[in-house]
Amino acid sequence: MANNKSAIELKNIVVDFGESVAIDNINLSVEKHQLVSLLGPSGCGKTTTLAVIAGLIKPTSGQVLFNGYDVTKKPPQERKLGLVFQNYALYPHMNVFENIVFPLYSDNSWKQAVLEKNSVANHEINCLLLTSNGASVQEIDQLNKLFHDSIEKPKQIQYQINDLNVSVFKNLNELTANLKLIPSKHQFAITNLNKQTLKQINELEAEFKTKWKLQKQTPIKSGVEHNAKLQAIKQHFSYEKQRLKKHYFKTKVELKQTLVENLKLVKKAISEQTKLIKQSSDYTKLKQLKRLIKVEPNQLKKQYKVFLNQLIKNYSLKTDKLTDTQLNEIEQIKTRIVSIKQFINKTALEVANKLAITKILTKRPDKISGGQQQRVAIARAIVRRPKLLLMDEPLSNLDAKLRVQTRQWIRQFQQELQITTVFVTHDQEEAMSISDVIVCMSTGKVQQIGTPSELYLKPANEFVARFLGTPEMNIIECSVKNNQLFWNNHLLVTESFKLNVEKLLVGFRYEQLVVTTNKSSLQAKLINIENLGKHLVATISLFDTTLSMRLELNSHLKVGDSLNFIIKANNLHFFDIDTKQRIEI
């Protein structure tokens, strides 16, 4: 069943802007109720990935699934999600309450859900009244079926339409996306050609000036010979410059021809694909369903109303035969019937109470603190009760202390509401403390997916190893001889390891380096000390390499001192020297 699927699934997502690939074939699943962090440096593609999930950016290729349903083509407002950005974007002319409720007034699907709840309550009351006035079990069952069909059948038809839209137009959509990319890729190629040609001309001019200057400075033995050499230099420069220009214009023409040919090929492929689609049985079924969705909801509602009116005519909706218990039950059901405005106020107050901002509801955004603004932004994002909450570096505008407090609060709040959350950050400490799962990214690719402890204790490659942990992991190149590790022909650790390579990268955390009095151990020079309050972080230099190590606060070492140290071998990490991937032993 679809509701057993992952909350979010990205399949082979590519975002190609022509001049650069922002996301390179990402596959990712986010399970229900998890808080998943997209972690990586600037430019790694994490915010673009979030934008694809939100529907703010259309992928060049690939699928976005929510609970098993394809939403790749759906706009953000139809994805039932909440968004919190780096800039909270609160409306300055509205107070906190008005900011929170604003999305509700502009969300037709949310209003429709409220009206549907009212319809359910009214239907339950009608069933109770009709039963008390003599309607049979079979008649009530038929009424329930007609009501259920009027609500659920249009939804099922829409789900079928969505699924068919994806399967029928998948190849065509990819071709159309490629067609849109061709001009930008052509422009990128022209830009590169311009840069390359300009660089070559500048280099040629620099070479010409150097040769001209040298010839000018050369002692003159013969004026004729001297002038001839100058003329030769000038002619060579003119010839080379002309050659570059010819090459430039020729390449430009070739690129233009390639553009025209590519456009022609893709347009032809689109035309052929369109013909195939129109001949397919799925396309015929899709057209039938689209016609059906226009009339079926009204027909189903009409059938329900006709049967309901017939039952009312036969049995009435009088309350004189109801017991006190039944009357109380009806009154209880009536409390669920509210106007749009009443429901908006009730929902907003519930959210404000959960986020502890009820005392500031009448204040404007400029009259509250940064932390409060952030909570208001979250309240506005979740007031529609979205299935997903997307947060793009929401803590970056807060000071260090408030950032720690707020991330703890977000985690607690997310666990209480059990809302599936995707959290973008470049701060590895933030991601480690708040996440169920971390997706570590670099250059548009997923480097590793796992729990915070999995990424920290077993990094999949050198990038993850360096990125997670403060200070970053020490990584050095070592050779392997007789199952022992050597760094610049010095024994690294006394322990042996079964490694089937001659060279590899060895990683170790700063706390694994320990000062020793053993003079035969590795010796380094202390070049920097940072006092972090609870301990010291020292930077040492050895074999033209800097390493980080931990020192206790009572250490008497100072910058410039030499020290001997050993490396604890119990948590060494090994990476392939070429692929940079983790080596398990």
Swiss-Prot record:
<dbReference type="GO" id="GO:0016887">
    <property type="term" value="F:ATP hydrolysis activity"/>
</dbReference>
<keyword id="KW-0813">Transport</keyword>
<dbReference type="InterPro" id="IPR017871">
    <property type="entry name" value="ABC_transporter-like_CS"/>
</dbReference>
<dbReference type="Pfam" id="PF00005">
    <property type="entry name" value="ABC_tran"/>
</dbReference>
<dbReference type="InterPro" id="IPR027417">
    <property type="entry name" value="P-loop_NTPase"/>
</dbReference>
<protein>
    <recommendedName>
        <fullName>Putative ABC transporter ATP-binding protein MG187</fullName>
    </recommendedName>
</protein>
<dbReference type="InterPro" id="IPR003593">
    <property type="entry name" value="AAA+_ATPase"/>
</dbReference>
<feature type="binding site">
    <location>
        <begin position="40"/>
        <end position="47"/>
    </location>
    <ligand>
        <name>ATP</name>
    </ligand>
</feature>
<dbReference type="InterPro" id="IPR008995">
    <property type="entry name" value="Mo/tungstate-bd_C_term_dom"/>
</dbReference>
<keyword id="KW-0547">Nucleotide-binding</keyword>
<comment type="similarity">
    <text>Belongs to the ABC transporter superfamily.</text>
</comment>
<dbReference type="GO" id="GO:0005524">
    <property type="term" value="F:ATP binding"/>
</dbReference>
<dbReference type="GO" id="GO:0055052">
    <property type="term" value="C:ATP-binding cassette (ABC) transporter complex, substrate-binding subunit-containing"/>
</dbReference>
<dbReference type="InterPro" id="IPR003439">
    <property type="entry name" value="ABC_transporter-like_ATP-bd"/>
</dbReference>
<dbReference type="InterPro" id="IPR012340">
    <property type="entry name" value="NA-bd_OB-fold"/>
</dbReference>
<dbReference type="InterPro" id="IPR047641">
    <property type="entry name" value="ABC_transpr_MalK/UgpC-like"/>
</dbReference>
<feature type="domain" description="ABC transporter">
    <location>
        <begin position="8"/>
        <end position="468"/>
    </location>
</feature>
<keyword id="KW-0067">ATP-binding</keyword>
